[in-house]
Amino acid sequence: MFRGVFPAIITPFKDDGSLDEDGLRRNVEVLSKTGISGVVPCGTTGESATLSHEEHKKVVEIVVDCSDVPVVAGTGSNNTSEAIELTRHAADAGADAALLITPYYNRPNERGLFEHFRKVAESSDIPIVLYNVPKRTGVELRPDVVARLSEISNIVAIKEASGSLTQVSRIIELTADKNFAVLSGDDDLTLPMLALGATGVVSVVANVAPRATVEMVNAFLDGNITRAQELHYRLAPLVRAMFLETNPIPVKTAYRMLGMAAGPLRLPLAPMSDENEAKLRDVLTKMSDLTGDMR
């Protein structure tokens, strides 16, 4: 299952700030037809930190209902009981897997990290994808802990966004004898990570250029390294544009520019600066051949 491109999708809101359920359905239906391997709702890109529990659950239910591809639902929390609740809900709603970020802010030690993920995994049979993004959480999920967690039967993959290829290499080395997948969590490192043995990406840029991202990953996995390199560099300006400001500010702004359902950001995220919005618009205009599916 964990092979290919999994866009981490945005959560569209109406002008009054409420969830845009129809817009969410339209976005997912369009993305589902672009060759992607799955969608990831309620992650960082989906503004999960500002969703109420009811909204979080509703988003998962809607995406499961309308998606033609597997759904990997974000269910992480820095409260283990809350993560268990959200993970069980995702399983009951019909999600195909759950993505769990490392507990943030309270910065658990390695024993706490292991026990957190073990407890969540034991609470449900749903496949679990670990998510390591220390720049956001303040805590590092070290390769040796990942290796221990990979021995738990339903912990089956990791989204690795540490930015360290050394770490990625070590995780793949330590889990080589397990049925355990490594997915890139950094669009700009997807190709290098594939070279180390990763099998796909949970992607931001695939929201706006899904087919090109899919082609890049598939080209590499099929052995066409030259074509994968060409697409890596072709996508590079768009990848940089997606991170002109904190994710998901640029990608949500891009969706608005492309005519997709987006709506406002929720505070404390604020609109892009005029300067960066102009840069983003320029990149989208120049790369319209890659974003045509999302117009």
Swiss-Prot record:
Pfam families in UniProt: DHDPS
Pathway annotation from the record: Amino-acid biosynthesis; L-lysine biosynthesis via DAP pathway; (S)-tetrahydrodipicolinate from L-aspartate: step 3/4
Catalytic site positions: Y131 (proton donor/acceptor), K159 (schiff-base intermediate with substrate)
EC number(s) stated in the UniProt entry for this protein: 4.3.3.7
Protein's UniProt keywords contain Transmembrane helix: no
GO cellular component, as recorded: cytoplasm
Any one GO MF annotation of this record: 4-hydroxy-tetrahydrodipicolinate synthase activity
Superkingdom field: Archaea
Cited PROSITE patterns: DHDPS_1 (PS00665), DHDPS_2 (PS00666)
Compartment(s) of residence: Cytoplasm
Record-annotated site: Part of a proton relay during catalysis: T44, Y105
Annotated pyruvate binding sites: T45, V202
Catalytic activity, as annotated: L-aspartate 4-semialdehyde + pyruvate = (2S,4S)-4-hydroxy-2,3,4,5-tetrahydrodipicolinate + H2O + H(+)
Assembly and oligomerization: Homotetramer; dimer of dimers.
Physiological role: Catalyzes the condensation of (S)-aspartate-beta-semialdehyde [(S)-ASA] and pyruvate to 4-hydroxy-tetrahydrodipicolinate (HTPA).
Protein's name in the database: 4-hydroxy-tetrahydrodipicolinate synthase
Gene name tied to this protein: dapA
